[in-house]
From Swiss-Prot:
Binds 1 Mg(2+) ion per subunit. GO terms for molecular function: ATP binding; magnesium ion binding; succinate-CoA ligase (ADP-forming) activity; succinate-CoA ligase (GDP-forming) activity. Heterotetramer of two alpha and two beta subunits. It comes from Bacillus cytotoxicus (strain DSM 22905 / CIP 110041 / 391-98 / NVH 391-98). It catalyses: succinate + ATP + CoA = succinyl-CoA + ADP + phosphate; GTP + succinate + CoA = succinyl-CoA + GDP + phosphate. Coiled coil: none annotated. The keyword Ligase applies. InterPro entries: ATP-grasp, ATP-grasp_succ-CoA_synth-type, ATP_grasp_subdomain_1, SUCC_ACL_C, Succ_CoA_ligase-like_bsu, Succinyl-CoA_synth-like. PROSITE patterns: ATP_GRASP. Pathway: Carbohydrate metabolism; tricarboxylic acid cycle; succinate from succinyl-CoA (ligase route): step 1/1. Residues 9-244 form the ATP-grasp domain. This is Succinate--CoA ligase [ADP-forming] subunit beta. Succinyl-CoA synthetase functions in the citric acid cycle (TCA), coupling the hydrolysis of succinyl-CoA to the synthesis of either ATP or GTP and thus represents the only step of substrate-level phosphorylation in the TCA. The beta subunit provides nucleotide specificity of the enzyme and binds the substrate succinate, while the binding sites for coenzyme A and phosphate are found in the alpha subunit. It comes from the Bacteria.
Length: 386
């Protein structure tokens, strides 16, 4: 789960991590009032959306007086920002962060992520702050430094100091930088983050180390023990289809293609998308109905797939292990009748009760194309979609 920058900074502040003072605003008047309350010579007006690249898209402006705050707030609120992370449709700005300006001396990058290859949290840092870390990794990977953290003992002071020296934090500010990184690590672990990224971390003219931006993502599987984090969820920033899917424990991710996929199991779902691409088709989604799907869940899955107007055909690919093929077949038949499906539908069933499942499909009287294998199904749906 993602949250906004201002929410992430509030969490960091509660852990003693240094961030600039700021206030959230939902209207132009609130933005002006927030700037008055901050009482600083310079304010930064920042669009709050769940995407990076806001500055390049015109979503971050420096205001030197209240009139500029008003002008920028009027221009940004309600506008649609298009960045490399939003897709071509962009995201509408519905809230702003009004923040005190900083006398920036130098920008750095600091982030914590889980390295699945080593099963350890890794602290990454670079003195190339303010730019996309992926770009740094591609062009100058030698400028990224890493410390792998033993989960039994956590981040150690010497590791944080080593990182601070590697990225050339001024010696007199190393102590602050170490405290900053230790606090960030506590947030990452105690709040079950999947990413804790500060880009940029800055040193200021008055000798401070602070987070100028903050990106915190959380492991959705751990949200049951973080009710406070769950309350920060902004449904306006999420795809309505994903929200609807989550109500039925369906894992749905929209893509840009025109072939809807309904599969059980994440691995099979990825393999299904791969084989559709192999036969020159384009999947419209990743949709995993899970191991315990019912006819109701299958029906809802169909409705979610069909809510995407780009979908021109559907490929159902089920391997019945825990899941029984007859249950899926009943769900497919019921869903097809309920939604009045007119698009091409290819179904491949294999596993538990497969013959019974095929019988249900064959006797349904519906225009369902049967596939004998995953490759056969992919070829058929690609051909039908054209």
């Amino acid at each position: 789960m993602n949250i906004h920058e201002y929410q992430g900074k509030a969490i960091l502040r509660s852990y003693g991590v240094s961030v600039p003072n700021g206030k959230v605003a939902f209207t132009v008047e609130e933005a002006v009032e927030a700037a008055k309350e901050l009482g600083t010579d310079v304010c930064v007006v920042k669009a709050q959306i769940h995407a990076g690249g806001r500055g390049k898209a015109g979503g971050v402006k420096v205001a030197k007086n209240l009139e500029e705050v008003r002008t920028y707030a009027e221009n940004i609120l309600g506008s649609t920002l298009v960045t490399h992370q939003t897709g071509p449709e962009g995201k509408e700005v519905k809230r702003l962060l009004i923040e005190e300006g900083c006398d920036i001396k130098k920008e750095y990058y600091v982030g914590l992520v889980l390295d699945r290859a080593t099963s350890q949290v890794v602290l990454m840092a670079s003195e190339e702050g303010g730019t996309e870390i992926e770009e740094v990794a591609e062009k100058t990977p030698e400028k990224i430094f890493k410390e792998y953290i033993d989960p039994a003992v956590g981040l150690q002071g010497f590791q944080a100091r080593r990182i601070a020296f590697h990225i050339n934090i001024p010696k007199e500010l190393v102590g602050q930088a170490v405290k900053f990184m230790m606090g960030l690590y506590r947030v990452f672990i105690e709040k079950d983050c999947s990413i804790a990224e500060i880009n940029p971390l800055v040193t200021t003219g008055d000798g401070k180390v602070m987070a100028l931006d903050a990106k915190l993502n959380f492991d959705s599987n751990a949200l049951y023990r973080h009710k406070d984090i769950l309350e920060l969820r902004d449904l306006d920033e999420e795809d309505p289809k994903e929200i609807e899917a989550s109500k039925y424990d369906l894992n749905y991710i929209p893509l840009d293609g025109n072939i809807g996929c309904m599969v059980n199991g994440a691995g099979l779902a990825m393999a299904t998308m791969d084989i559709i691409k192999h036969y020159h088709g384009d999947p419209a989604n990743f949709l995993d109905v899970g191991g315990g799907a019912t006819a109701e869940k299958v029906t809802e899955a169909f409705k979610i797939i069909l809510s995407d107007k780009n979908v021109k055909g559907i490929f159902v690919n089920i391997f019945g292990g825990i899941m029984k093929c007859d249950v899926i077949a009943e769900g497919v038949v019921e869903a097809t009748k309920q939604v009045g499906l007119e698009l091409p539908l290819v179904v491949r069933l294999e596993g538990t009760n497969v013959e019974l499942g095929k019988k249900i499909l064959n006797e349904s009287g519906l225009n369902i194309v049967a596939a004998e294998s995953m490759a056969d199904g992919a070829q058929k749906i690609v051909s039908l979609v054209g």
